[in-house]
Amino acid sequence: MKFKQDYFDQLSGFYSQVTPQGLPRPQWLAWSEDAAALIGLKQPDDELLQGLAGNQAIPGASYYAQVYSGHQFGGYSPQLGDGRSIILGEAEGPQGYWDVALKGAGMTPYSRHGDGRAVMRSAVREFLVSEALHHLNIPTTRALAVIGSDLPVWRETQETAAITVRLAKSHIRFGHFEFFCHSEQGSKDKLKQLLDFTLSQHYPELSRDQAGYIAWFNRVVADTAKLIAHWQAVGFAHGVMNTDNMSILGDSFDFGPFAFLDTFEEDFICNHSDPNGRYAFGQQPGVGLWNLQRLAQALVPIIASDDLIAALNTYQHHLVQAYLVLMRDKLGIKLVEPAGSERDEADLQLIGGFTLLMEANRLDHTNTWRRFAQLDPNSQHSSLRDDFIDLAGFDTWYQAYQERLGQVSDVAGWQAVRAQVNPKYVLRNYLAQEAIIACEEGNTQPLAELHQLLTRPFDEQPEKEAYAKRPPEWGQGLIMSCSS
């Protein structure tokens, strides 16, 4: 790996330099060739294993933990920071630079009484979801590898330590700006320094003045809205949408007790530390705006309040428009003239009517949408109908749907497009859990097979049909722990 160190060199005081605590007897548990290509790596070898396990220095790496704060479940935590993640620097790849971070590489000044370790369970889940979201065409950080060991660590029970090697275009979070606004170490000059760095690295086309700052914040609002529209369309619940888990690039970031919906439930909670459902699936769009408002508050010293408010007021428009594009594609309906608020509202009612039916009839989210790839849209007798208990409700909806759809001239082509936007396979929690159990028993083959499956989520893969089934009784509606 060839590194540059722009964050380390240009933002002194925004991090602490640290030394990794290596993993004894490390072993490769998972490796993403896709992600490796981003930074010019090919096959994993023992030298790389020892380096990424924190056991020997990698030439050119700097090893630092970033400081930030954030709002967690609505309350402000004045200092958080990388408590177990160590960034090596920005690695050069064929099409740009990627931060390389070792998540679980030991204690830092920000560990807050933690041990700085990650357990194998959480490392495997982060690896799988990072790569799954990417192949679902959803903006996300990437995962290069999982490195396991036999080092015991204690959470609710004894587990083994592991490292996820994360790649990110940036690790700058909403919480970075909050820290340098609200903390004693912060100042207007440091906020401006951080924002100027962000623009120079990721938005070089924008000027480093008020006009550029406003344009940047508008971009962050739009990108965040579009990301959450993707989550809602595919049925992904992040689970811990704290502001320190929000990327300024609009990437999915910092995965814990996430879930893809099995049965469609608007109020589904995937995190057992969230009994009130602050981060329930259906709450995510509103939380996205709330988090942007917290970011805006932190930017008041350097961006005019009126401009921040004006940008925030565009969030709902960006969210709805992005959601409509995705859901029209899933349903196979075209945007017809006249476009505008009346047409959008009618389509939102059509989409909402279908999701309400799915919820009332306890249907599987992924499998139900996938059925549109086999649907004859011109037939009065929908193959979907048999899935519903409320036949009258479905018939009413389907009639409205066909009227909106119109006659389809190329049915096979229409179905093929639906198959490319309605995935057959998603990372169901029970599938991840089965792979984790196998890893605990020393068998990484199920993890490798699941990873490969998730790189082709839209393909039929008939030999993998079992992965598309609804979860067994033990795996239904799994609620995951924040402990990792």
UniProtKB/Swiss-Prot annotation:
It catalyses: L-seryl-[protein] + ATP = 3-O-(5'-adenylyl)-L-seryl-[protein] + diphosphate; L-threonyl-[protein] + ATP = 3-O-(5'-adenylyl)-L-threonyl-[protein] + diphosphate; L-tyrosyl-[protein] + ATP = O-(5'-adenylyl)-L-tyrosyl-[protein] + diphosphate; L-histidyl-[protein] + UTP = N(tele)-(5'-uridylyl)-L-histidyl-[protein] + diphosphate. It comes from the Bacteria. The keyword tRNA processing does not apply. Mg(2+) binds at N245, D254. One of its GO terms (molecular function) is magnesium ion binding. The keyword Cell membrane does not apply. Keywords: ATP-binding, Magnesium, Manganese, Metal-binding, Nucleotide-binding, Nucleotidyltransferase, Transferase. Its EC number is 2.7.7.-, 2.7.7.108. ATP binds at G81, G83, R84, K103, D115, G116, R166, R173, D254. Belongs to the SELO family. Nucleotidyltransferase involved in the post-translational modification of proteins. It can catalyze the addition of adenosine monophosphate (AMP) or uridine monophosphate (UMP) to a protein, resulting in modifications known as AMPylation and UMPylation. This is Protein nucleotidyltransferase YdiU. It comes from Shewanella loihica (strain ATCC BAA-1088 / PV-4). The gene is ydiU.
